[in-house]
Amino acid sequence: MRKYAGCLSVKGNYRKKNQDRACCLSSSKKGILFAVGCVCDGIGSFAQSEIAAEMIQVGIERWFLGMEPLYPENIDEESLLDDLDMTIRELNELIWTYRKENGIDIGCTMSLLVLLNEKYHVFHVGDSKILLIDDRVSQITKDEVSVVERDGKLKTLLANFMGKVEELWMNQSSGSLVPGETFLVGSDGLFKRLREDILFDVIRRKNVQSDTEAEDVLKYLIRHVIEMGEKDNISGVLIRIV
């Protein structure tokens, strides 16, 4: 199997800085599908949460660059995923330690998609999302939020994030890849004003056939949600399986 992929992260028109981070990397080895797409959304109520998002982005990129020469000749799929799990937990502890040592609150969500030959693997913390688009739009991550009542109104709060506690709790799942599927990893800035029917129609009409076209679809979606009034940072990774 092969894939086409695009990755974008923008500040948007209202926020003073971009607290999101996104990355997408893939193996250059012939006949090997090994790729990662990751989006981290810094918690807006914490003034310096881009530090946490940057830690995750850099950590995942370093992990991939370390594993790419080894897979599949010198490390199998199970060992590779175990190593990634351990790396994510170490990054979480790094953020938690930074908070304690510097006396500041930072944190971020993390939605990470790993493609390994004929399977996908999800590592997820927080309320960013990963959608799978085939003959419909399906969310394959769970929003880790809690609903509380304040001043007589229901309010949604983030229940889990990278750096919240020293010992990370993380959602994981796996599935089989099918040619024609599209994965969209994104921060809540991408999804809050994006209707499923519009997303489905865009994916079907555009029929991505290159990395450039994948990025063009992301640009289109980001432009659309900004026009719809989105004020948050917006980040996404789009991957089509062929």
Residue ranges and their predicted role:
Residues M1-V242:
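PP2C/PPM-type serine/threonine phosphatase catalytic domain
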